Amino acid sequence: MSTTSSTVTSAFVDAIVARDFAGARGLLHPEIDFRAMTPKRIWEADGPAEVEEVLRTWLADPDEDIAAVEAVDGATVADTERAGWRVRGTGPDGAFTFEQQAFVRERDGQVGWLRIMCSGKRPLGGA
């Protein structure tokens, strides 16, 4: 994670990289304002448990083998931090990668506002 990131944002990305969904949920404010966009869907969730389920949908699909989740550099834009992660794996259609960028605002020392944008799965190695 970038040195410009707050402790809570860094901890959130670390939890994503480790696929520690319960740990990520524990960093979310009870009144989290969450929205995300993937290529085919707009996601909204009310509360930390629903956000955890969204994260599991993206990163714990039983039909896919996730080989790696790696943090990518972030930055700060006023009161909003940008953080991200890149995923590599294999699914029914072969090897893939995708990247997600998260925009985070803190509230009471937790993630209180979270927007995530996904690149969509892209084939790797001639897949």
Q: Can you name each region flagged by the protein language model?
A:
Residues 1-30, 125-127:
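Short, low-complexity N-terminal intrinsically disordered segments enriched in polar/charged residues
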Residues 4, 8, 50, 96:
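Soluble or luminal CAZymes and related metallo-dependent hydrolases
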Residues 10, 19, 32, 94-96, ...:
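Short non-domain terminal segments
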Residues 15, 35, 89-90:
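Alpha-helix C-capping/helix-to-loop hinge sites
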Residues 23, 29-74:
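A solvent-exposed, acidic/Ser-Thr-rich amphipathic alpha-helical stretch
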Residues 52-127:
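A beta-strand edge to alpha-helix "cap/lid" segment located at domain peripheries
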